[in-house]
């Protein structure tokens, strides 16, 4: 092909004719990011002989300014007539094809390298995808038109070009340096076989990452579930338990399978891509994506499970859209059965959603079918997505992980770990979430509403608002095998039993959930709305003049740059003034002018809503805010005291907010933050003692505002402890303490004018009490009553004096005493 001037002329004419219809693009700009050494020969390798594929590659190389594959290339003193070859050689005149044969071009290049006729040669694997979809056995439309795992014939390729040619994607992969392989001195033949094997594996993994594994039809998949031994056993037990025939029990299992299974359809994926492209451009100012390249690298050869945070219903669509646009297979998505609504449910199912009930309790047959469905997805290499938080976060915080799906994943992996599983955390950060008005009601205490198809019209009515930007950050992957090696060494050799439920499963699953939550928080995207919310909600009147607010924001940005939370955390562009203008443009800030300048404030509605956006990043500011709190009641504190009180309080902050640092790392991290405080003028250091600025200074005001970021959290801690101490030993249960804390917090919020409903969120008190139990500070007797360690008094009085103002401590103690006098604990 293209070996003579006449054939090159014909090829050029064919390419021009092809591009009268075809439109192509490189996946993630891969042609523009190749790191090629132009002084050394470059060869492109395609998997199968295809003139149309070659024409597309030639066009993309021309667009990117890369060496063209159809032009001659010098290899030492020898001139190769073209700079490409096929991994599977072209057929001979009789149509015969040696699929294991070695390309003559590759043979000659390796020979030249072995003879040192040339220093090196670069091999660039290139994949061309006509459309992007997994294959299905019985869908004639897709078998004819979409890229799949089947060998493509000329007629089928022609139809593919006509139907899918306007959605052609090209992936240029990292160059392979042949010199590195030749220098292994394995001889000509073995080196050629090694190169051939490397390329063959590469193309297989690349294809799986982009179009997905080879899949079977949904009906066949569901039928296959009921033939699994574990499901057959569950069917037999169901028949015996319910006194029905095996046929009826099997029919019920099939109904469960059809209720659960997705119906992944390429036409719907393409339809959603077109609709969502319009939607994102209509409603958002842009989508920022970070570290998707790392996902592309790890997707090859792994079973990928995406574990995003859950802030909005459009999380499902956004992640699938971005993966598809970046040349990765959209995942099969776990969705609550409440979303299986008329019209919407069918669309989501064809877009990759599979549906699950909120609880599996009391239905072992459903449990067996669901577990087997997930095991099938995992073992066949389908990417999967589920939300470890369970539901959407209404408060903006990372919710405590629901470990059900993680446990199913762990058990599936223990059953068969042929394909390594990797969890990919995905942080999705909104400057304004679509469901903001709904969340506003729920933040004010309204009950959670059931999803309805009519919610769509509410979203459409909100399109006139400005929603800013969305950031999607891919965090540090968690390889399940490595995690198990750390948590349970020797797990591969253990006898796990037929149900794959080792005794350590629950504890290990809980630790895995915490690891995922921390990795999600590490990938946080800090945006202007987060920072403005953090600053203004820390003021007593929810207001600052514009210059003061800009100074606060500049301080926060400087601190975050001095002590980065994690390599995966991203910061907004611009200074404090630019951030303010951005948030004003979204109508989240009110403004009042007077003779002295501008006052920026939050009205009542936005004040509640902005707690949601503050909470998105509270975990990042919790530790520096805690350190700043120590200086609200003390002018001078030694490093040793700072560390002692930090270590006393940090475990509870870490448990609530999923902060990344372990207790062993605190010394170094605290030193970094203290150094940053000194650099910004918030503290002075005298030997081993840190000194706060004068109370009348601007720096002390900034230090105070920072400390208030975590004030309500610390007040909740003190409330629970004060109530417990006043109740006495073995006098109150955890549930009773939760209720009392909630009532007390509601009363204090009225007394002190706190407009933050999460202040009396019962679940936060529940988790704090559990943390006290985990730390050994509390114990439960056989009746469930709580007793406390003597250290609790020290924690309450010693640390609380350092971080809470005297009037707040007095008010909390007074309310606790009033409760004891009015409602004595039951004996």
From Swiss-Prot:
Annotated GO molecular function terms are: glycerol-3-phosphate O-acyltransferase activity
Per the Swiss-Prot or TrEMBL record, what residue ranges does the short sequence motif HXXXXD motif cover? 309-314
User: EC number(s) of the enzyme?
Assistant: 2.3.1.15
Write down the superkingdom of origin: Bacteria
UniProt pathway annotation = Phospholipid metabolism; CDP-diacylglycerol biosynthesis; CDP-diacylglycerol from sn-glycerol 3-phosphate: step 1/3
Family from the record:
Belongs to the GPAT/DAPAT family.
Name of the protein:
Glycerol-3-phosphate acyltransferase
Organism of this sequence: Ectopseudomonas mendocina (strain ymp) (Pseudomonas mendocina)
Q: What is the lineage of its organism?
A: Bacteria, Pseudomonadati, Pseudomonadota, Gammaproteobacteria, Pseudomonadales
Q: What gene is behind this protein?
A: plsB
